[in-house]
Amino acid sequence: MGNSNELICIGLEGTAEKTGVGVITSNGEVLFNKTVIYTPKIQGIHPREAADHHAETFIKLLNEVSGVIPLDKIDLVSFSQGPGLGPSLRVTATTGRALALSLKKPIIGVNHCVSHVEIGKLKTDALDPLTLYVSGGNTQVLAYTGKKYRVIGETLDIAIGNCLDQFARYCNLSHPGGVFVEQYAKEGKKFLKLPYTVKGMDISFSGLLTASMKKYDSNEKIEDVCYSLQETAFSMLTEITERALSHTNKPEIMLVGGVAANDRLKEMLEIMCNEQNVDFYVPEKQFCGDNGAMIAWLGILQYINGKRMDILDTKTIPHFRTDMVDVNWVVKSTENELDILNKKRQIPRHLIGKGAEADILKGRYLEWESITKERIKKGYRTAELDEMIRTRRTVKEARFLSIIKDFSVNSPHIFDIDIENKKITMEYIHGKLLKDLIEEGNLEFCKSIGELIGKMHEGKIIHNDLTTSNFIVNTDAYMIDFGLGKYSDLIEDKAIDLIVLKKSIMSIHYDKFGEIWDKIIEGYSKYGHSELVLQYIKEVEKRGRYL
């Protein structure tokens, strides 16, 4: 190692079209950080051309580094091992190996996604954030729990950056397209109705992209299409982040990734955080997009916490998921850090609950105990979109809470519906949330939960927001919160329903996940369609970006 107490690491980033080199110390001081983007002459990234760009650019950037700090002062070499494009990753890994061997220094391959989270924490005051990671290749909602960054929500098809870039290419805009979409969106005035697809804490952009292209083809102004595309997509992202916040009760939210540079997305998330009374963080622009400093910083964190890697272990991992990384550096047993990790989002005292969509107030309806669920206005959404969503979901919830009883699924009785004010007054169920029972170690009702879901699916009803927060248990189990519900007998929709539940369990009940999931599936398997649905879960999960 070097002569001082500081460890100096050089990081090489090259997962797609951006080539980055960064140098950082173990005290978090960035000595060098530069990224050069490959801009294709013809729209779209060609993997081989991107790899050639890396090969040329790494040499230039390393020469620049040597003018700032002698390379023999480097103590550690870190490189992005994945996820990413195969050709790009191979060039990056080869450069890292050659550099480590020539300098006779240790080498560590790191996860690109986790690097974004850790550089964000370094460059902000965030300590235990719920993280929205948005880029050209990734869209994930992440939370640290059980020594991993768990993927609580993610895209079911394409990433948000990819969506924006594809639309820009369709409109003959230059790469990277998201920048031009943002510029045009600022001039848009007319909001165009587009598909809004949220499934629990997961999200889908493919339908939105196709519809936006059709709007462009129908001679709508490009400014209005970009405005509507951006407002719809970013509202969806903000909503799934808020849903994850409601489920995990994290005290802070952080935005990272290349799309984090978008001012409108930052504005939306900040508004939501103010409404939920949690802190919001986003690193400065140079640390939002892909960069070498983030790779170097994660290399340091892993190295000083015991990670070692032989040169033979540096094979690239194109499908390197965030939740594959063992995270042993977050808590180091100081009382202050433990207090931070135990800190939770606070719910206003006059409410008995505050979800992602609604405030829950306890009261009385005639002689019965009741709760009133009010879908409150969301300041981050345009007025037209907000009114449409709140009205539609209030109607849906009232309808499905009533219909679900026809299939022997318990749900609260509805006393009153106020569509104008987006309120539903319903029976107060004495009991505990399934989430709280599991935290107490009581898994007795998990099999019954599986049976309820099976009955619901036999009735061709999809909940679309199955989490352990949406079941109440006393002597029986009750299902609640049908605002995203729909009719469908598609095997895929039933599989996605269960996947949403699976992720919610893993996000906060990771230590009991196997036992909980086995019991739920045991109950669900009583129903005739179950075998096909359970098989299809594996097919849907394979679509996950970098699974």
UniProtKB/Swiss-Prot annotation:
Which Gene3D superfamilies does this entry report, sorted A to Z? Answer: 3.30.420.40, Phosphorylase Kinase, domain 1 (3.30.200.20), Transferase(Phosphotransferase) domain 1 (1.10.510.10)
Decide whether keyword Ion transport is in the record: no
Q: Write out the residues that bind L-threonylcarbamoyladenylate.
A: 133-137, 165, 178, 182, 262
Q: How is the cofactor bound?
A: Binds 1 Fe(2+) ion per subunit.
**Could you name the active-site residues?**
465
Q: Which keywords are on file for this protein?
A: Acyltransferase, ATP-binding, Cytoplasm, Iron, Kinase, Metal-binding, Multifunctional enzyme, Nucleotide-binding, Serine/threonine-protein kinase, Transferase, tRNA processing
**Where is it predominantly found?**
cytoplasm
What does the subunit comment say?
A: Component of the KEOPS complex that consists of Kae1, Bud32, Cgi121 and Pcc1; the whole complex dimerizes.
Q: Which family does it belong to?
A: In the N-terminal section; belongs to the KAE1 / TsaD family.
User: Which named protein is this?
Assistant: Probable bifunctional tRNA threonylcarbamoyladenosine biosynthesis protein
Its taxonomic path starts at: Archaea, Methanobacteriati, Methanobacteriota, Methanomada group, Methanococci
